[in-house]
Every structure is written in structure tokens, then in C-alpha cells.
């Protein structure tokens, strides 16, 4: 069965609370629920994870990437300087 890792970086846990006019009213839980429900219809399993700490994101990626068919990563605030996370992504081929 196809499986996806859904990984979200810093401050994504604040969706729905932080400036709804810019980020919307859906919470991270709401989005994860929508993703998981849609994936289930496609017979895809999902494993969602969010952290505000780059090291935790790297550990999750390293511990789970070999079992996953694919990875969807929103690095959020780490987009510009998350070199450790980038290296972990490259190594997760």
C-alpha cells in the first residue's frame, strides 16, 4: 500500500489561531483530517507530524522515510535556513 509522510515545520501548529485573515481559519488538525480522509479514499496511508524544532523534524524523517512511498514537506520557517532538514531530505531517497 502507498504511504505518505506529511511533515509540517515551525508555527504551522498555529494555523486557525494566528492571523486568520492571512493564514485562514482551518487548524492544522482540520487540514490533517482532510488530507487523511482524501488519502484513505485513494487507498493511501498517511502519517502526519509537526514540530517547531528542526531536530525533531529530522529525527522523524530519518525514522520513517524508509517505510514511506513519498514525503510531503512544508518546512515553513525553515525554508530559508533549514540546511539540516534539507540534508535529511536528500538522504531519504
PLM feature spans:
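Active-site donor-nucleotide binding/catalytic segment of nucleotide-sugar enzymes
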Residues: 12
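Glycine- and acidic-residue-enriched helix-capping/strand-helix junction motifs
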Residues: 15-29
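Loop-to-helix element that buttresses phosphate recognition and phosphoryl-transfer chemistry
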Residues: 27-41
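Helix-adjacent hinge/juxtasegments
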Residues: 41-90
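Basic phosphate/pyrophosphate-binding loop/patch that engages nucleotide-derived ligands
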Residues: 93
Amino acid at each position: 500500500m502507498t504511504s505518505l509522510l506529511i511533515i509540517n515545520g515551525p508555527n504551522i501548529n498555529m494555523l486557525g489561531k494566528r492571523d486568520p485573515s492571512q493564514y485562514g481559519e482551518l487548524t492544522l488538525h482540520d487540514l490533517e483530517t482532510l488530507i487523511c480522509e482524501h488519502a484513505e479514499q485513494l487507498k493511501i496511508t498517511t502519517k502526519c507530524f509537526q514540530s517547531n524544532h528542526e531536530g525533531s523534524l529530522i529525527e522523524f524523517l530519518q525514522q520513517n522515510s524508509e517505510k514511506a512511498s513519498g514525503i510531503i514537506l512544508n518546512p515553513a520557517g525553515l525554508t530559508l535556513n533549514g540546511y539540516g532538514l534539507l540534508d535529511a531530505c536528500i538522504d531519504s531517497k
